[in-house]
């Protein structure tokens, strides 16, 4: 009996739905817009005015107005609001089976509920009230499943006509009032809007209503414009008709709204897919057609198919909005190396150039979208779609959740790093697609910046997302670097290819984001305008962009809070965010094999027939790391570009035989050879090469930094009282060095060993001077007049002087590990030997690297300290004034002994203390602190104290000694925080020990305080200079900057009464009040000394060959072979 009642109720619902549509055709036929009916009330079609009309129930009494109001309210509410689309989604998903099961669920009290359903029959007033309810909640989706709760059903109590049944229905939590009402009116809604073709009367009316209310965009295929959620699209039986209707509108009104289903390229793509599936061999083979023509696969079409598949793989179809697919396909086409434009003499396919192309290709679609929406902010909407693409790619690249990324631990010995790869590496992508996605994100981030470049980055609407993305990418890079370090330490070198590809792409994208957040895009215009995107992807292709954050993040934090972000979200965002990292150096080391690929050498023949006027002047700029020249397509000059010596300056240390020089450069690109490696007939060559590692003609860069690898000041002069050995023997040096590594040497043996090494270095320096003099002498006289006797005597002397070289000594130290072993037995002798070797031209940086990578010992710390303090060598007496130096020299000449004897009894062969350049000092400290941190970390893992904690007592002593050393350097002004590049390494070293050693804690926070103070001082100085030298443009920009500060202050949460001013918000409020948005960041590293926007022509080797020329050359080659 109950089943029969349920069936009866279901039948009543069906009858009600079918009867609801009886007069709908009449409604459409006699439709009159409300704008005409309410002309006397000056009604203007808009959502706000429509909502006011619905609240005026006196309008419902007029049948003519009521019927037309119902149509307009139904179209606008259901198809252009979020709440209405929630109702439509339920209608679309409610199948016949679901409705039947819903009716059967109310077997009890069925008569009362049936009466409710009957009360809804032909009740337009209730339907209008329901549409009013939806319109009042137009910006929020309906949580339909919760409308069984009384608090949710109460606003819908107007649907219950009988006042007696209201309490029982509202309190019945098993009954969903909203769902029952929607099921009841489903049939009527479907019949009301249905149309058999796009040109039926109902369809035309729908289109007119949407256009009058300017809601065509919101209705378009039921998309959610500003939503990151994967909303399910509503596909009712009439949705395709409405979509087609808008596509066929006059003037192609919807052509710019991007519906891929009606794209003109759809047919070719389907043809490609069908051909690929049915005949896969066509991809790999070429077959003639029946007419004899050759059909070759279309690379462009296959790339289009690849981009379409990526769009689906990224799951962007679930968040599809107008222009989204068009933007994605345009980005793919521009960044894909197979489809992007080819470079020419006027353009470089740079990031900035691709951005301009992107805007040009999207301009027509943007204009069309603006025609349909008066309030359309195309910049924000373009960037909003870009953010959707970035989020989708990061999700696919497994770089979306920071908590998951931060929980991965590759250094855990109990878990192998390979078992953790699935947690942070992408799945189902090859390296080409991975790099393509990162390229897409790079152009997307740059677009977000460029469209809002007129305002400070702190006010960019997508600032929060950019910082979050940078944070995730930094975590991914750290994980990848850990794996590469582990493999290098184990000697296996099996870093997976996907890990290398991930770090390559992530580092490139991170550098763009960091440049944007640091406000350095204009400073780094060279990278964005003069380097191609493919070059930019390499760590060596990016000449200026850093991946680290150097900006004052307090301004970003204050702006986020002022613009509405919650304090909890901002706190989570900036937690675990480490600015000023040095990942870029590790990445360059990881990809060192790419260095020569992006610093390619060139020869004079590369210029071809070009005039000297069109040859790039910077082609004569030497690479900082190689003795080659590389070609740039711009006139930009960097501060570390080496100044090339002119004319005779090169010849002083060069060769008159150009062929020998070119051969030497080819054989050893990393070593810059001295003149004696390739001399003319006037200077005799020898099979033993000199130890020179850097050419002395490239001495200073454009910022004035001294890059010479030579002894300095008085170290160039020999001590008058020092007794050199004319012919030092290699076997004596070899035997004494090996003996000193195992047993204690007596004083005579120690002095003999030191004198032999000093003599080798001195002989090489003399030979270099002789070569210089010989070259100058040969250039000034006629070579025919030279006497053979002088030449032969020079040959004999040179052969004697070159029997033993510093190369031989360094080889013994390195291969036999003799030096490191000697430190355990004869450390005084070993360090004096190091002093003498540091006088060798070209070996100083090599020796600095060598000694900083030795095992950390107390004597090593002492030696580094003495080097920096100027206590090594032979310090002058007194205050080291000019008079003191003269007195010491006169005393030594007259007395034949040094005035200040060394405590070790091992005299120094040169004059004065050992002097290091700023570059050498920075290198010494940076390498020392970094390797000390690595050594101490490994030492702690090997030893445990009595409590079982991994703390080495030996390490405690070393760290305490390092702290004392740094404190002394600071006190003597030998450690400059702003100029030093080793601060990060020192902080990393101290970080582990601040909770163990009080000295480490005091030093760590002292460094942090001094850094903050000096940054503030430098900022104040920059602001003072900026105010002093400000031009008219800066004066004009001063007013908007102050207005921005005032606006942000007004947007801050109001100050609570009776509260102190110590809260973070009040601190940030005070900070932002005086903050200047023109503040510039000064990151370390390379800088542009001269920037020129001119693009130079392509090198001849890089120019594409025309097809007819290629065929001609091919025919000539075939003819020659025959």
From Swiss-Prot:
Which residues are annotated as modified residue Phosphoserine in the UniProt record?
1042
The alphabetical list of record keywords is: Activator, Cytoplasm, Nucleus, Phosphoprotein, Repressor, Transcription, Transcription regulation
Q: Some GO term, biological process aspect, for this entry: which one?
A: positive regulation of transcription elongation by RNA polymerase II
The UniProt regions of compositional bias labelled Polar residues, in chain numbering, are: 11-24
Give compartment(s).
Answer: Cytoplasm; Nucleus
Q: Which GO terms describe its cellular component?
A: CCR4-NOT core complex; cytosol; nucleus
Spell out the residue ranges making up region: Disordered. 1-24
Quaternary state and partners of this protein? Subunit of the 1.0 MDa CCR4-NOT core complex that contains CCR4, CAF1, NOT1, NOT2, NOT3, NOT4, NOT5, CAF40 and CAF130. In the complex interacts with NOT1. The core complex probably is part of a less characterized 1.9 MDa CCR4-NOT complex.
Q: What does this protein do?
A: Acts as a component of the CCR4-NOT core complex, which in the nucleus seems to be a general transcription factor, and in the cytoplasm the major mRNA deadenylase involved in mRNA turnover.
Please tell me what else the database record remarks about this protein.
Answer: Present with 1320 molecules/cell in log phase SD medium.
Protein name in UniProt: Protein CAF130
Which source organism?
A: Saccharomyces cerevisiae (strain ATCC 204508 / S288c) (Baker's yeast)
The UniProt gene name for this protein comes to CAF130
């Amino acid at each position: 009996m109950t089943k029969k009642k349920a069936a009866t109720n279901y039948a009543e619902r069906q009858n009600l739905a079918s009867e609801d549509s009886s007069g709908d055709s009449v409604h459409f036929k006699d439709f009159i817009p409300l704008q005409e009916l309410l002309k006397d009330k000056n009604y203007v079609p808009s959502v706000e005015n429509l909502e006011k009309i619905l609240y005026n129930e006196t309008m419902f009494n007029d049948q003519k107005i009521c019927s037309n109001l119902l149509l307009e309210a139904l179209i606008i509410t259901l198809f252009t609001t979020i709440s209405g689309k929630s109702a439509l989604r339920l209608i679309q998903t409610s199948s016949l089976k679901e409705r039947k099961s819903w009716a059967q669920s109310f077997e009890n009290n069925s008569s009362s509920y049936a009466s409710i359903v009957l009360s809804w029959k032909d009740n337009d007033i209730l339907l209008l009230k329901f549409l009013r309810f939806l319109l009042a909640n137009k910006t929020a989706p309906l949580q339909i499943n919760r409308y069984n709760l009384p608090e949710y059903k109460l606003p819908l109590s107007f649907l219950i006509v009988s006042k007696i049944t209201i309490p029982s229905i509202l309190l019945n939590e098993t009954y969903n009032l909203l769902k029952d009402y929607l099921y009841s009116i489903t049939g009527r809604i479907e019949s009301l809007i249905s149309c058999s073709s796009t040109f039926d009367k109902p369809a035309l009316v729908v289109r007119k209503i949407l256009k009058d209310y300017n809601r065509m965009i919101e209705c378009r295929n039921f998309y959610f414009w500003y939503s990151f959620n994967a909303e399910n699209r509503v596909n009712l039986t009439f949705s395709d008709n409405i979509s087609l209707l808008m596509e066929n509108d006059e003037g192609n009104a919807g052509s710019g709204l991007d519906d891929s289903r009606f794209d003109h390229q759809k047919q070719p793509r389907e043809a490609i897919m069908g051909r690929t599936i049915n005949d896969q061999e066509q991809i790999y083979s070429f077959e003639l057609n029946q007419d004899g023509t050759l059909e070759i696969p279309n690379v462009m079409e296959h790339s289009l198919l690849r981009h379409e598949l990526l769009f689906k793989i990224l799951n962007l179809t679930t968040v599809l909005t107008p222009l989204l697919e068009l933007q994605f396909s345009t980005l793919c086409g521009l960044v894909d190396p197979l489809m992007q434009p080819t470079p020419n003499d006027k353009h470089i396919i740079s990031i900035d150039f691709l951005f301009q192309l992107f805007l040009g290709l999207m301009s027509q679609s943007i204009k069309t979208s603006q025609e349909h929406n008066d309030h359309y902010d195309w910049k924000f909407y373009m960037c909003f779609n870009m953010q959707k693409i970035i989020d989708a790619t990061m999700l696919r690249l497994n770089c979306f959740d920071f908590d998951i990324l931060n929980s991965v631990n590759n250094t855990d010995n109990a878990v192998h790093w390979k078992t953790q790869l699935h947690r942070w590496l992408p799945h189902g992508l090859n390296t080409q697609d991975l790099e393509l996605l990162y390229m897409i994100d790079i152009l997307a981030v740059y677009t977000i910046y460029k469209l809002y470049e007129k305002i400070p980055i702190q006010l960019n609407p997508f600032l929060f997302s950019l910082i979050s993305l940078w944070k995730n990418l930094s975590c991914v890079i750290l994980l990848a670097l850990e794996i590469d370090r582990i493999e290098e330490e184990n000697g296996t070198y099996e870093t997976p290819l996907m890990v290398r590809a991930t770090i390559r792409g992530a580092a490139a994208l991170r550098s763009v984001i960091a440049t944007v957040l640091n406000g350095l895009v204009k400073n780094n215009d060279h990278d964005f305008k003069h380097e191609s995107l493919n070059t930019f992807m390499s760590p060596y292709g990016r000449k200026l962009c850093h991946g680290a954050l150097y900006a004052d993040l307090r301004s970003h934090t204050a702006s986020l809070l002022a613009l509405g972000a919650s304090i909890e979200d901002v706190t989570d965002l900036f937690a675990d965010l480490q600015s000023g990292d040095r990942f870029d150096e590790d990445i360059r080391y990881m990809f060192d094999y790419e260095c020569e690929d992006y610093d390619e050498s060139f020869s004079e023949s590369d210029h071809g027939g070009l005039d000297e006027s069109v040859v790039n002047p910077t082609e004569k700029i030497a690479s900082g790391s190689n003795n080659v020249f590389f070609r740039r397509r711009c006139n930009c000059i960097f501060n570390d570009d080496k100044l090339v010596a002119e004319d005779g300056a090169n010849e002083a240390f060069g060769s008159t035989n150009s062929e020998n020089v070119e051969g030497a450069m080819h054989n050893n690109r990393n070593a810059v050879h001295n003149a004696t490696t390739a001399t003319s007939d006037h200077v005799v060559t020898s099979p033993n090469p000199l130890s020179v590692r850097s050419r002395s003609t490239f001495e200073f860069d454009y910022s004035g930094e001294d890059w010479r690898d030579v002894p300095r000041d008085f170290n160039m002069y020999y001590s008058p009282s020092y007794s050199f050995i004319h012919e030092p023997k290699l076997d004596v040096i070899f035997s004494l060095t090996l003996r000193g590594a195992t047993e204690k040497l007596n004083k005579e043996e120690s002095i003999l060993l030191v004198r032999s090494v000093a003599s080798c270095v001195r002989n090489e320096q003399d030979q270099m001077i002789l070569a210089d003099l010989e070259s100058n002498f040969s250039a000034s006289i006629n070579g025919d007049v030279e006497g053979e006797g002088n030449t032969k005597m020079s040959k004999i002397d040179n052969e004697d002087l070159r029997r033993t070289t510093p190369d031989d000594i360094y080889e013994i130290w390195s291969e036999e590990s003799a030096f490191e072993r000697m430190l355990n037995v004869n450390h005084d002798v070993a360090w004096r030997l190091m002093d003498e070797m540091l006088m060798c031209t070209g070996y100083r940086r090599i020796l600095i690297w060598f000694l900083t990578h030795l095992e950390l010992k107390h004597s090593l710390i002492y030696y580094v300290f003495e080097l920096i303090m100027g206590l090594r060598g032979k310090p002058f007496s007194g205050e080291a004034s000019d008079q003191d130096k003269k007195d010491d020299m006169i005393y030594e000449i007259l007395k034949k002994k040094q005035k200040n004897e060394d405590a070790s009894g091992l005299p120094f062969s040169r004059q004065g203390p050992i002097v290091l350049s700023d570059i050498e000092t920075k290198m010494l400290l940076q390498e020392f602190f970094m390797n000390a941190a690595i050594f101490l970390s490994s030492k702690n893992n090997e030893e445990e104290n009595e409590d079982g904690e991994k703390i080495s007592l030996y390490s405690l002593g070393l760290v305490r000694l390092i702290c004392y050393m740094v404190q002394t350097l600071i006190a003597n002004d030998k450690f400059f925080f702003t100029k030093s590049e080793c601060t990060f390494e020192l902080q990393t070293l101290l970080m582990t020990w601040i909770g163990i050693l009080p000295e480490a804690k005091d030093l760590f926070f002292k460094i942090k305080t001094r850094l903050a103070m000096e940054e503030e001082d430098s900022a104040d100085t920059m602001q003072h200079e900026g105010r002093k030298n400000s031009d008219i443009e800066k004066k004009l920009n001063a007013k908007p900057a102050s207005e921005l500060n005032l606006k942000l202050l007004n947007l801050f949460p109001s100050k609570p009464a009776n509260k102190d001013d110590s809260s973070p918000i009040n601190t940030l409020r005070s900070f932002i009040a005086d903050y200047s948005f023109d503040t510039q960041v000064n990151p370390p590293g390379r800088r542009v000394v001269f920037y020129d926007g001119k693009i130079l022509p392509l090198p001849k080797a890089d120019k594409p060959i025309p097809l007819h020329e290629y065929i001609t050359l091919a025919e000539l080659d075939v003819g020659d072979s025959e």
